[in-house]
A protein has these predicted regions:
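Extracytoplasmic small-molecule ligand-binding "clamshell" domains
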Residues: 29-106, 115
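C-terminal segment of classical bacterial N-terminal signal peptides
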Residues: 16-27
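Flexible hinge/capping segments at coil-to-helix
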Residues: 134-151
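Ligand-binding clefts/hinges and TM-proximal coupling segments of bilobed small-molecule sensing domains
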Residues: 160-173, 215-216, 248-285
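Ligand-binding cleft/hinge of the Venus flytrap
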Residues: 55-57, 69-79, 159-179, 207-212, ...
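Periplasmic-binding protein-like
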Residues: 125-131, 208-246, 268-285
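A ligand-binding cleft/hinge motif common to bilobed small-molecule-binding domains
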Residues: 90, 106-115, 164-167, 194-226
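Short helix-initiation/N-cap motifs at beta->coil->alpha
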Residues: 81-93, 138, 175-190
């Protein structure tokens, strides 16, 4: 692949995961390309969202999204990054405030988000699902079920679930927003919520942690519009870097190396996104 970057030096300071690189192509035209050309660290922003993206014991970026992102960056000659962990609801504001350079948290590509950031080509296609009480006594499978039973839905602040529930007419006082998965499960287990709204991967982990008190709803009963593509978020101005990243990710996506590394997180060939869905998702999600 003809890349924009060629790595020539790497910092030995493990805590910063710093990278030193220079551009081999034309003079940089955007902030992130300039940053790499100047030998500065690329900062990746994410929250604690296993198995998508989360920090390890030493702050290192783990999860299947980071396998894909780091694999693509490596093809661009960038092998180390600086992780920045924040709450999910602060990811887009943090990118716009220049606290990091890329959002690697595993965001769905939604029209409301596309107004604020540019997304990469998709790294996967995903279904949402509800975590419900064992036996699903309220028969909750859709947003309409939440609405019609007067159930309380808990989800993360800034999650797509909030927007989808609102669009489906679930009253705002029946949607509880909390910082993340730990708080979502706590509210559910304490009886403050009847269902948890999340993506299939994260919801499956919450069921495992419920000690047999929960199960998953049937995701096939949700409408087609609830199917979503995940993307990596970039500043609007960083178009040159995004183009190079998309090229590199396209080469890495679905490779034997990638599929071997993401398997431990539950990502399979069924999750692969297909081609060219970013514009469609921005317009239709």
């Amino acid at each position: 692949m003809k890349t924009l970057f060629k790595k020539i030096a790497t910092s030995a300071v493990a805590a910063s995961f710093a990278v030193t690189a220079f551009a081999t192509g034309p003079v940089a035209a955007d902030q992130l390309t300039d940053r790499v050309a100047a030998g500065e660290t690329i900062r990746i922003g994410f929250s604690n969202e296993p198995p998508w993206a989360y920090p390890g014991e030493n702050g290192e970026p783990l999860g299947f999204v980071h396998v894909i992102v780091l694999g693509a960056l490596e093809k661009m000659g960038i092998t180390e990054v600086e992780p920045v962990v924040t709450d999910w609801g602060g990811l887009i504001p943090g990118l716009k405030a220049d606290r990091y350079d890329i959002i690697t948290g595993g965001m769905y590509i939604l029209g409301s988000r596309c107004e604020n950031v540019n997304f990469s080509d998709p790294f996967g296609v995903f279904a949402d699902v509800f975590v419900v009480k064992k036996g699903n006594p309220k028969n909750i499978h859709t947003y309409q079920d939440i609405k019609n039973t007067g159930s309380v839905l808990v989800t993360g602040a800034g999650y797509n679930i909030v927007e989808f529930a609102r669009n489906e007419g679930v009253p705002s006082d029946k949607v509880m927003e909390v910082p993340g998965p730990t708080e979502m499960l706590a509210a559910f287990m304490a009886g403050r919520a009847d269902a948890i709204g999340s993506n299939f991967f994260a919801a499956s982990l919450l069921v495992e942690k419920s000690n047999g008190a929960a199960e998953l709803s049937d995701p096939s009963k949700l409408p087609d519009w609830a199917l979503n593509w995940g993307g990596i978020g970039f500043r609007k101005a960083d178009t040159d870097f995004l183009a190079a990243f998309n090229e590199a990710m396209g080469e890495y996506m679905g490779s034997d190396d990638m599929m071997a590394k993401v398997a431990e997180y539950g990502y399979t060939s069924d999750t692969l996104p297909g081609d060219g869905q970013t514009a469609y998702a921005c317009a239709n999600r």
